[in-house]
Amino acid sequence: MAVHNLKDLLAEGVSGRGVLVRSDLNVPLDSDGEQGRITDPGPDHRVGADVERTGRGGRQGGGRRAPRASQEWAGPGVVAGPGGRRARRAAGPARAAGLGRGGHRRPGPRRGVDRRRRPAAGKHPVRRPRNVQGRRRAARAGRQMAELVGPTGAFVSDGFGVVHRKQASVYDVATLLPHYAGTLVAEEIAVLEQLTGSTKRPYAVVLGGSKVSDKLGVIESLATKADSIVIGGGMCFTFLAAQGFSVGKSLVETEMVDTCRRLLDTYVDVLRLPVDMVAADRLAADAAPQTVPADAIPDDLMGVDIGPGSVKRFTALLSNAETMFWNGPMGVFEFPAFAAGTKGLAEAIAAATGKGAFSVVGGGDSAAATAVELQLLFPLVRLIARLA
């Protein structure tokens, strides 16, 4: 089945039509969260159509309100509930990009979609959405989203990290409207093909994050293609435990230890583990960090970042790479005391990119880390912030 893209939609014509664009907006809606996905929706919002933007987001945490932590967004107005003011603030860059007044609240029902008559094409802006989560049936929400653009409307799927999800704003609405792949989806597929096909060598991969189970497929896929794979973040402790090393109170997926041992045996010349770690007695901003050997973390401490010796070793490796892919932070970068490893490797990747290497940063966490620590280096690195 052929995949229709934005060029096909433009060829058909968008004048007088509504276009529903699904973006990947799944970021924490708090004062510290990274706003890149909200403030930089991408080129599909500049095609001159009457655009409605949809997405899904939420707040971190659990408790009694946890079932409502995720919200699907669609249609006129702003996010109803947590993060509403944040979405309105994020609308500011939309004005600078010529997208209209995004985030403008129109009168209408507090919940659901405003079904009032749509303004004439081109007369209203790209709008931040109203919360449509909490409906008993996702199909109903999908129908209401489709109603936003009317019977002549179209649906553009531009959230690469969510295209596989069976959500109202991804799946149901696509069954109701002519649908097209957005520019960002097409670009990210092209980049991934470059990373998994013929690449310039040396080819280095940097993987972080909490769990080996989340990255197992990536490791097994790239281990036969890359020259080296750096393992950091919380996932490195399961690999260290698989070698029989003491990891203290660090995160370990016990059910993945045998898998890590197999990977280490199979790809001994490819996988690279830290030689030292930054450790602390607890995960807190005021916890005192100390550097310890990676193979002998004290029982009363947990690893929270890769150490300076590891940063030096991995920086030397990355400085010679011609192709690089980074997915996941090296430590708990949200706390400045535990962010040096992530920042150091990001600087190394940016420096190599400035000399002509091809580099890709993928994944919400590592993209956020780059944004927070290295905003001036952003133009040097191909960022796939939507790649999970």
UniProtKB/Swiss-Prot annotation:
Superkingdom of origin: Bacteria
Binding site for ATP: K215, G303, E334, G363, G364, D365, S366
A Gene Ontology molecular function term of the record: phosphoglycerate kinase activity
Pfam families xrefs: PGK (PF00162)
Residues engaged in binding substrate: D24, L25, N26, R37, R56, G57, G58, R59, R117, R165
Chain intervals with Basic and acidic residues compositional bias: 34-55
SUPFAM superfamilies: Phosphoglycerate kinase
Tagged with keyword Lipoprotein: no
InterPro entries reported for this sequence: Phosphoglycerate_kinase, Phosphoglycerate_kinase_CS, Phosphoglycerate_kinase_N, Phosphoglycerate_kinase_sf
GO biological processes: gluconeogenesis; glycolytic process
EC number(s) on file: 2.7.2.3
Keywords: ATP-binding, Cytoplasm, Glycolysis, Kinase, Nucleotide-binding, Transferase
Cellular component, GO, one term: cytosol
Catalyzed reactions per annotation: (2R)-3-phosphoglycerate + ATP = (2R)-3-phospho-glyceroyl phosphate + ADP
Main EC class the enzyme belongs to: transferase
Basic residues biased stretches: 102-136
Family: Belongs to the phosphoglycerate kinase family.
Subunit structure: Monomer.
Protein name from the UniProt record: Phosphoglycerate kinase
